[in-house]
Amino acid sequence: MEHARLFAYDDWANREVVSTLRAEGAPAPALRLLNHIVGAQWVWFARLRSKEPKMDVWPELTLEQVERELEELRRGWRDIWNRAIQGRSIEYRNTKGERHTSRVDDVLTHVLMHGTYHRGQIATLVRQGGSTPAYTDFIHASRSGAV
């Protein structure tokens, strides 16, 4: 399956989480994890473009700011597909300052899995708070035509 479709799913799932947190009230730990998803995506996006990240991996954003950042990221990831950098490798420093080289495809897969992992944590927090978490299963997105 191509990364572009999976990033469309990732964007949809993040927006579903935003909608749920807005409707149910965003517990601070859940919002912090959603912020981390956004911050980490900006860090990886910057690494792919050999630029400095817009924010760190644990930013403090409101739900409204998260929405705006997700919209900007959606456009940015589309630009990545247009630049056709898949199949290449990038060199970067991690948050500890250690130098690494990774395949772009591996970075993209990591970004997707990272978001899925933390959305699962958010779902647990929402459920523990007595609310129903966003239904973000990929198959649901596919069946509903979201991706």
Residue spans for each PLM region:
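Short, contiguous alpha-helical
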Residues: 4-57, 96-147
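Helix-adjacent hinge/juxtasegments
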Residues: 53-94
